[in-house]
Regions:
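RNA pseudouridine synthases
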Residues: 1-291
Length: 291
C-alpha cells in the first residue's frame, strides 16, 4: 500500500488531496468516502471536511485493480499514440467513462479495445483518463498509458501549461471581436446537475475571439484557461450568448442546431518522456453545423 502524507492548509479534504494533480477531485472524494483517509490518525469520510491548518492527513492508496470496464470494438479516431500516451478524438454523444446509466459504449470501453495498456490512477472505471469532455462535446482528449505519464500530464493541467482550444457556435451577435470571461463557477444550489456563476465558486477563466459572425450566431475560437465542469457553456450563457444546441444552459428561441455546437479542436502539451512540444488539431465533424 502506498501512503500519501500531507499537512492540511485548512481547505476541503478532497481539494487538498487533488492539488498536486495525481488524483482528480472526484477520485479523491471517492477514496475519502471509502475510508482511505485519516486526519490526525482518525478516519475521515467526508470529502467536504476542512481539517484545521497543520493537521496531518494520510491517504492510503489502495492496490490498483484491473479495470472493471469491458473492452468493446467501438470505432475510435486515434490521432497519435506511442508507448506512453495517445491522443484520440471523442465523437459527439459518447460518454467518457462508465457510470450509472452508462455501463458500456463509452470512450473507456473503446480505449480498452484499441490500446495495449492504460494508466490506473483514474480508478477501475476511468483507466487512462487524464481529462474529460461532456457527453455531447466532441474533440481531442489525451490518454495516459502508464501512471508516471498520467501524473505528469495532470501536473501540466494543474499548472495550466497545457493549451486547449475549442470551437463553439453561440447564439446572438457579439458586440466585441474578442473578450475574456473571468467569473467563478460552482455547482448550482438549485439543481445539482447544473453549474452556475457563484462569487464563492472556483476561479474560472475563458478567452474567446470571433472566427465568423452571422445575423443570429457566431463561431468562436475559445481558449480554455481553467477546466471547470461545463465551463464554456456556463460562461457563454452568463454573457447571454449560449452555445447552440445546449439543452441545459440554452434559451428559448435561439437558432436550432443538430447537436451541442462545442468541439475541442486543438491541444498542445509537453511530452512527459521526451520533452517535445506536441500539438494536435482535429476539425469538427460534418454535423457541426447550425440550421
Amino acid at each position: 500500500m502506498e501512503l500519501l502524507e500531507l499537512i492540511s492548509d485548512g481547505t476541503r479534504l478532497d481539494v487538498l488531496l487533488s492539488k498536486d494533480g495525481t488524483l482528480s477531485r472526484s477520485r479523491a472524494a471517492d477514496l475519502i468516502r471509502e475510508g482511505a483517509v485519516t486526519v490526525n490518525g482518525k478516519v475521515e469520510n467526508k470529502p467536504s471536511a476542512k481539517p484545521a491548518a497543520g493537521a496531518q492527513v494520510v491517504l492510503t492508496m489502495p492496490e490498483l485493480k484491473p479495470a472493471l470496464a469491458e473492452a468493446q470494438d467501438i470505432p475510435l479516431g486515434i490521432l497519435y499514440q506511442d508507448a506512453h500516451l495517445a491522443v484520440v478524438v471523442k465523437p459527439c454523444g459518447m460518454v467518457v467513462h462508465p457510470a450509472a446509466g452508462n455501463p458500456d459504449g463509452t470512450l473507456v470501453n473503446a480505449l480498452m479495445y484499441h490500446l495495449d495498456q492504460l494508466s490506473g490512477i483514474g480508478g477501475e472505471m476511468r483507466p487512462g483518463i487524464v481529462h474529460r469532455l461532456d457527453k455531447d462535446t466532441s474533440g481531442l482528449l489525451m490518454v495516459a498509458k502508464d501512471d508516471e505519464t498520467h501524473k505528469a500530464l495532470s501536473d501540466q493541467l494543474s499548472a495550466r501549461t497545457m493549451e486547449k482550444h475549442y470551437y463553439a457556435v453561440v447564439a446572438g451577435v457579439m458586440k466585441e471581436q474578442e473578450g475574456v470571461i473571468d467569473t467563478p463557477i460552482a455547482r448550482s444550489k438549485n439543481d445539482r446537475k447544473k453549474m452556475a456563476i457563484d462569487p464563492l465558486g472556483r476561479p474560472s477563466r475563458t478567452e474567446w475571439k470571433i472566427v465568423w459572425q452571422e445575423k443570429d450566431r457566431a463561431l468562436l475560437d475559445i481558449h480554455l484557461i481553467t477546466g471547470r465542469t461545463h465551463q464554456i457553456r456556463v460562461h457563454m450563457a452568463s454573457i447571454h450568448h449560449p452555445v447552440l444546441g445546449d439543452p441545459i444552459y440554452g434559451v428559448k428561441n435561439m437558432p436550432h442546431a443538430k447537436r451541442l455546437m462545442l468541439h475541442a479542436y486543438s491541444l498542445r502539451f509537453t511530452h512527459p518522456a521526451t520533452g517535445e512540444e506536441m500539438r494536435f488539431v482535429a476539425m469538427p465533424e460534418e454535423c457541426f453545423k447550425a440550421e
